[in-house]
């Protein structure tokens, strides 16, 4: 095959400018992003690359959020789907450490890194974008909207309050605090089965969130570094964190590991160790979502103390007395990260709600949300609840299997509030689905999509809910992103983009599989095309239904009732399409859609076959799925020409 057939949307325009100071204490920008975390930084970079001016407001001095400021230097999932800016970040890590193999130091992830290195990479990415103004050590205190512009009031490190006026506001905060300020309805905790229709959801809703973790980054000093016994220390709190003599009744007997495996779980390059241990380790329960600032500070204090008691247990009881908090990782007084690792936030009521059912059976739902995907993931549903001590019966959500999945654009859009895009872990997903969508590569893609959506809205002077789904998707695809979570069509494949685009129309559908930790969706580009494989063609082109019937009485016909190639479909192939069938079908649809005459379509398909390196001379040969995707994409352009709304339905 040859190069991909695609069109690149260029959004750079003179109407978009850098953020600037209008009057004393008032700045103007196209976009304000609250939060410079995992999604905030990618939103800023993507928006700036599309020509928008951006102000990023971040409470800490670091960029990257859970990946850096919270200490989770271990990327979960998407190793084989390096989508967009997540792929750029991974490549930058590999360049820093020497290779992708050099990142495989711990067994929890194939991408391990020191948080400080990740922070520098994110700062470098932002520094390259001249349209980004970065305000660190700053916090959004209030927001208002006058019908045209947002006024975002920001407390600065010097004690002053500055205001940024912007057309679009992006909430990339850790707990969705801006969405709450804006009056967006939201959920906290687990929804009931009646709400989400998920079989494994609880019968009754509750407000239980996942455990958070205050991560510790340790290093080996080569000498005894045992700390003083912390206040409130009780060895029984951690006795069953691993296999050891103190463990009598483990909460999770099937998840017991030797102590050395516990430590190497999060081994980082540079000889450091991430302590983010979920099995009776330093997970900590605190529902901080709706707490006051004072209550949050107290919860953070308790979470830190819990982690330090666990570090002492490791030193004193397990013999790891040469390990202690790294003195060259965080510039904090206590050497701990800037913030806890939040696994769950408030989740907005969005234009759509993404659930476990959309993950497991994307093609069987009332809303075909897969057509609107803007991010992909392949991590199982992973919930942490071992430190919760309430009486409620919680569903067993330890790595519930799912295939790889895509996240819809409508999950970033609140139902009512205009010109607000919500990112990070506050998107409109169910509590159960959040167990997969919360992981770092997905959240980075969410941010990139938020930035693209915001920038396009500014450029086109539209509401964020008026922007074409396909336009956002095309920008992401051209930026190296994935729309469909195909494991067998890698990004460097020559037919990657055609397969992505055709997959997003539903004309050819993927097949989800989950085997152990291998969660995949397969496009099967080299498989022959069965007739039922292209039932989706009639969803895009309703008149094509008659072309897909192949019983004894119905021939392959064009819409004027004429035989396309002089033979009935059955005469050519009952079970699978031949090359001749495919050419005839595509040519007939092109004619009906008034795209081109049959002869012109045949010429285009001959050119595409040459370009993409496959042969169409043997009309009896069974055509492959990847080949058919190229022909449909290159002649009919259904992705570009058949627009969809945020629910995935075609706009007729």
Where do the PLM segments sit?
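Boundary at the C-terminal end of the N-terminal hydrophobic targeting segment
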Residues: 19-24
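Terminal recognition/anchoring or ligand-binding modules at protein termini
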Residues: 504-561, 565-652
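Bacterial N-terminal signal peptides
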Residues: 6-17
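Flavin (FAD/FMN)-binding glycine-rich loop and adjacent Rossmann-like elements that form
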Residues: 137, 155-168, 172-475
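N-terminal Rossmann-fold NAD(P) dinucleotide-binding loop
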Residues: 40
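Conserved N-terminal/central alpha/beta ligand/cofactor-binding core
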Residues: 46, 52-53, 58-142, 146, ...
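Charged, amphipathic alpha-helical linkers/stalks
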Residues: 486-489, 496-508
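Beta1/beta-strand and adjacent pyrophosphate-binding region of the FAD-binding site
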Residues: 25-37
């Amino acid at each position: 095959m040859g190069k991909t057939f695609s069109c690149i949307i260029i959004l750079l325009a003179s109407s978009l400018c850098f953020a600037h100071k209008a009057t004393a204490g008032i700045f103007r920008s196209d976009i304000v992003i609250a939060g410079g975390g995992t999604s905030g930084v990618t939103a800023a970079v993507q928006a700036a690359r599309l020509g928008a001016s951006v102000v990023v407001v971040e409470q800490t001095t670091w960029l990257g959020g859970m990946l850096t400021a919270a200490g989770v230097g271990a990327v979960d999932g998407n190793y084989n789907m390096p989508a967009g800016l997540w792929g750029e970040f991974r490549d930058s890590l590999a360049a820093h450490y020497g290779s992708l193999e050099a990142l495989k130091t711990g067994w929890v992830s194939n991408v391990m890194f020191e948080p400080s290195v990740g922070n520098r990479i994110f700062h470098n990415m932002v520094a390259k974008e001249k349209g980004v103004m970065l305000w660190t050590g700053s916090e959004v205190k209030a927001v208002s909207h006058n019908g045209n512009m947002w006024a975002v009031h920001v407390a600065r490190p010097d004690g002053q309050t500055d205001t940024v006026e912007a057309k679009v506001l992006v909430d990339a905060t850790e707990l969705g605090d801006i969405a709450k300020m804006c009056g967006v309805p939201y959920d906290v905790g687990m929804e009931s089965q009646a709400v989400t229709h998920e079989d494994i959801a609880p019968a009754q809703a509750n407000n239980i969130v996942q455990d958070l973790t205050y991560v510790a980054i340790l290093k080996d000093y080569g000498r005894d570094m045992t700390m003083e016994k912390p206040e409130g220390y009780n060895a029984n709190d951690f006795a069953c964190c691993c296999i050891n003599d103190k463990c009598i009744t483990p909460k999770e007997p099937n998840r017991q590991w030797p102590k050395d495996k516990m430590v190497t779980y999060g081994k980082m390059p540079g000889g450091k160790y991430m302590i983010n241990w979920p099995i009776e380790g330093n997970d900590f329960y605190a529902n901080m979502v709706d707490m006051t600032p004072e209550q949050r500070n107290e919860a953070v204090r308790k979470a830190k103390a819990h982690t330090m008691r666990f570090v002492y247990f490791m030193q004193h009881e397990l013999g790891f007395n040469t390990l202690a908090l790294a003195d060259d990782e965080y510039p904090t007084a206590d050497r701990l990260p800037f913030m806890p690792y939040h696994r769950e936030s408030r989740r907005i009521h969005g234009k759509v709600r993404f659930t476990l059912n959309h993950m497991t059976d994307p093609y069987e739902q009332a809303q075909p949300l897969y057509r609107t995907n803007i991010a992909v993931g392949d991590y199982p549903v992973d919930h942490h609840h071992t430190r919760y001590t309430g009486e409620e019966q919680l569903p067993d959500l330890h790595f519930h299997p799912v295939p790889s999945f895509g996240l819809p654009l409508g999950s970033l859009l609140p139902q009512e509030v205009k010109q607000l895009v919500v990112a990070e872990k506050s998107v409109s997903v169910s509590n159960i689905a959040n167990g997969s969508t919360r992981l770092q590569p997905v959240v980075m893609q969410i941010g990139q999509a938020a930035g693209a959506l915001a920038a396009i809205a500014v450029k086109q002077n539209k509401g964020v809910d008026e922007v074409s789904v396909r336009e956002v998707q095309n920008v992401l695809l051209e930026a190296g992103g994935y729309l469909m979570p195909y494991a067998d069509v890698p990004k460097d494949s020559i037919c990657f983009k055609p397969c992505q685009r055709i997959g997003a129309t539903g004309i050819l559908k993927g097949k989800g599989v989950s085997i152990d930790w291998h969660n995949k969706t397969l496009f099967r580009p080299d498989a022959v095309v069965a007739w039922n494989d292209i039932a989706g063609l009639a969803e895009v082109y309703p008149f094509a239904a008659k072309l897909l019937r192949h019983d004894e009485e119905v021939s392959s016909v064009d819409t004027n009732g004429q035989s396309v190639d002089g033979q009935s479909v059955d005469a050519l192939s009952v079970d699978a399409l031949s090359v001749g069938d495919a050419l005839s079908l595509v040519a007939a649809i092109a004619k009906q859609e008034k795209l081109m005459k049959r002869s012109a379509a045949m010429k285009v398909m001959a050119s595409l076959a040459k370009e993409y390196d496959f042969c169409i001379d043997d009309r009896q040969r069974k055509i492959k799925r990847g080949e058919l995707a190229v022909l449909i994409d290159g002649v009919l352009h259904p992705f570009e020409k058949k627009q969809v709304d945020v629910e995935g339905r075609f706009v007729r």
